[in-house]
UniProtKB/Swiss-Prot annotation:
This is Probable DNA ligase. Keywords: ATP-binding, Cell cycle, Cell division, DNA damage, DNA recombination, DNA repair, DNA replication, Ligase, Magnesium, Metal-binding, Nucleotide-binding. Gene3D superfamilies: DNA ligase, ATP-dependent, N-terminal domain, DNA ligase/mRNA capping enzyme, Nucleic acid-binding proteins. It holds the Pfam family DNA_ligase_A_M. It is an enzyme of class 6 (ligase). GO terms for molecular function: ATP binding; DNA binding; DNA ligase (ATP) activity; metal ion binding. Its cofactor is Mg(2+). ATP binds at residues 213, 220, 235, 264, 300, 372, 378. It comes from the Bacteria.
Length: 520
């Protein structure tokens, strides 16, 4: 199969709004890949259309892609050949490795057509956002293999590897799915939560009674133990065992032989209050930091204990087993109630302790690994800021031809200018995209556009605009960042509305943002 086949499918899917249409388009491509009877080809195709590399990280980012050769006139690259190049790039190490990687990238892109270059660039930089994510992809795999979608989703959940499931089912049909079972030592995708507006909303949606748990702003980890062997994985299924000895020790102290647990690792201050998330995150890069910044581990769910799979057991049963095995020092605070006032007090106490909010779980919900299940709801306060738009990026896929990703700035009273805090393309409706495209083209500052574009705001990736438009932004927190001049960045920023009633002089200041950073 040629790379252009995958690149074209990516463009097609990105332009589609219908889930059924996306599913059908991807299924057609996978059916063609399946006829070549090459398991790796199928797995790579699924991974790429999901925006992932089978090799994970290969050391190529935006800097390596700034100066690329002219595109080839005709498509010749195969998926298999490109996959091999990625593996070769990822294996480069030692003296001269940067130059060697650059040479391989240049050679690859010189053989790629324009549409292929665009696809490869977006794939390598993590910006392949065409909507073909796990749900759609699982349905497409099922359609291509002519098996029930629920069976594919279940296998992908247990394997933690949809590309591998796709390769197996397209080669062996429904019978091939039987081999994908929950296994200690093989991580699965964590269950994710939907959002509730408050504890009352959560109780209503969960049937009147809920299991409320403190939501810690740490790092989600999945713990696997078989005898004296313990493995620890991140939510993206990366193995971080060697970096988190405290988690290993906590798992080994439990009175079990086999275990799979869902947990949170977090850096706490001496008074028990949490450090900023970045302090916790820093430990995932350096095991040696334990001496200066230890981590605490809090388990909140069990997927497997001593030969028994608990995925399909209700929350209430899994919690009961958890309480029997895990000491209180390693469990999150919990309240089971149908009383809205009691739930609100629990939320307020959790926030006062410095944590993010609470999780509300249905007592009857199974553990839906890898899915954002309706049985889990997160409740946390939403912070908002009025910021100023400094620039906008042209969109891709369904947003091609629309100004999409906005650059956000806070007012700096000391200089009279604005300090950039990040970007977001989240929360925008189609109507908002239409409006902001027209609005920001009006505000485009020709003098600020690159000379290479002829000062034309429509020619280039980013449009610099006059800082006149105020936008209300919701965000979950503020973290330190070396990427932006203020040393801070918003976490999970999304657009609520544009504030035409406010002038830039009324926007929030960088000092207000710094207060969020310092005090939460």
């Amino acid at each position: 199969m040629l790379l252009v086949d995958v690149a074209t499918a990516s463009v097609d899917v990105g332009a589609m709004s219908s889930r059924l249409a996306k599913t059908a388009r991807i299924a057609d491509l996978l059916s063609r890949a399946g006829t070549e009877q090459d398991a790796r080809l199928v797995a790579v195709t699924v991974a790429w259309l999901s925006g992932e590399l089978p090799q994970r990280q290969i050391g190529v980012g935006w800097a390596a892609l700034r100066s690329l050769p002219a595109p080839a006139a005709a498509p010749t690259l195969t998926v298999t050949a490109v996959d091999a190049v990625f593996s070769e790039i990822g294996a480069v190490a030692g003296k001269g490795s940067q130059a060697r990687r650059a040479g391989l990238i240049a050679e690859l892109f010189a053989a790629a057509t324009d549409v292929e270059q665009t696809f490869l660039r977006r794939l390598l930089t993590g910006e392949l956002r065409q909507g073909a994510l796990i749900g759609v992809m699982a349905d497409a795999v099922a359609k291509a293999a002519d098996v029930p979608a629920a069976r594919v989703r279940r296998a992908a959940m247990l394997a933690g590897d949809l590309p591998a499931v796709a390769a197996a089912v397209l080669a062996g049909g429904d019978a091939a799915l039987a081999r994908f079972t929950l296994q200690v030592g093989r991580p699965v995708g964590p269950m994710l939560a939907q959002t509730a507006t408050g504890v009352a909303d959560a109780l209503d949606r969960l049937g009147g009674t809920a299991v409320f748990e403190a939501k810690l702003d740490g790092a989600r980890v999945q713990i696997h133990r078989r005898g004296s062997d313990v493995s620890v994985y991140t939510r993206s299924l990366d193995d971080v065992t060697a970096r988190l000895p405290e988690v290993v020790e906590a798992a080994l102290a439990l009175p079990v032989t086999d275990l799979i647990a869902d947990a949170e690792a977090i850096a706490l201050r001496p008074d028990g209050r949490p450090h900023r998330f970045q302090v916790t995150a820093s430990r995932f890069g350096r095991a040696a930091a334990r001496a200066t910044q230890p981590l605490s581990v809090f388990m909140f769910d069990l997927l497997h204990v001593d030969g028994a799979d608990l995925l399909d057991q209700p929350t209430s049963d899994r919690v009961r087993v958890l309480d029997d095995l895990v000491p209180a020092a390693h469990r999150v605070d919990r309240l089971v109630t149908d009383d809205g006032a009691a739930a609100q007090r629990f939320l307020e106490a959790t926030l006062a302790a410095g944590h993010e909010g609470v999780m509300a779980k249905s007592p009857n919900a199974p553990y839906e690994a890898g899915r954002r299940g309706a049985g889990w709801l997160k409740v946390k306060p939403v912070h908002t800021l009025d910021l100023v738009v400094l620039a906008v990026e042209w969109g891709s896929g369904r947003r091609t031809g629309k100004l999409s990703n906005i650059h956000l700035g806070a007012r700096d009273p000391a200089t009279g200018g604005f300090v950039m805090l990040g970007k977001t393309f989240k929360g925008m409706t189609d109507a908002m995209l239409d409006w902001q495209t027209a609005r920001f083209l009006e505000l485009a500052d020709p003098a600020a556009q690159p000379a290479t574009s002829g000062r034309d705001p429509t020619d280039g990736h980013t449009v610099k605009v006059r800082p006149e438009q105020v936008v209300e932004i919701a965000f979950d927190g503020v973290q330190g960042s070396t990427r932006y001049p203020g040393g801070m960045a918003l976490r999970f920023a999304r657009v609520l509305r544009y504030r035409d009633d406010k002038s830039p002089a009324e926007a929030d200041t960088v000092d207000t943002v710094r207060a969020f950073y310092e005090h939460g």
